[in-house]
Amino acid sequence: MNKQRTLSIIKPDAVEKNIIGEIYRRFEKSGLKVVAAKMKHLSKAEAEGFYAVHKDRPFFSALVEFMISGPVMIQVLEGDNAIAKNRKLMGATNPKEAEAGTIRADFADSIDANAVHGSDAPETAAQEIKYFFSDIEIVG
């Protein structure tokens, strides 16, 4: 057993489509437990800070603008191999390349409006969780 926590963000496009419950159902069906959650409309500074690792990439400005275009649902997921499990549920970054039945294949519109974000490694998961949640906000 490798119990982990990972950060997940349901992005503005998916929140707009009113599919938060469907995405949560997929988390829970795969054995992931939501141990913290909040809905938030990110400020530009929050989005820039969260995605600072990409600040020199050509897509940075568009990503920030997209992430502040509407509310997001941010959650901490916990479970065995939570990081890999969540990434498998999400599917490839580009929904056209995502396996059928993944969140992105089913709900994402484009590589930019791709429905969800998930941490990619234990180190980034820890940093991303701390960015949005204090220890007392996480149950379990």
UniProtKB/Swiss-Prot annotation:
Any single GO CC term annotated in Swiss-Prot or TrEMBL for this entry: cytoplasm
- On whether Magnesium is a keyword of this UniProt record, the answer is yes
Q: Which CDD domains match?
A: NDPk_I
> What GO biological process, any one, is recorded here?
CTP biosynthetic process
* Cofactor(s) annotated in UniProt: Mg(2+)
The source organism is: Francisella philomiragia subsp. philomiragia (strain ATCC 25017 / CCUG 19701 / FSC 153 / O#319-036)
Protein name (Swiss-Prot/TrEMBL): Nucleoside diphosphate kinase
Please tell me where ATP binds in this chain: K11, F59, R87, T93, R104, N114
Please report which protein family the annotation says this sequence is part of.
Belongs to the NDK family.
The role this protein plays is:
Major role in the synthesis of nucleoside triphosphates other than ATP. The ATP gamma phosphate is transferred to the NDP beta phosphate via a ping-pong mechanism, using a phosphorylated active-site intermediate.
Active site, per annotation: H117 (pros-phosphohistidine intermediate)
Q: Which Gene3D superfamilies match?
A: Nucleoside diphosphate kinase-like domain (3.30.70.141)
The cellular location(s) given in this protein's UniProt record come to: Cytoplasm
Its subunit composition reads: Homotetramer.
Give the source's domain of life in one word.
Bacteria
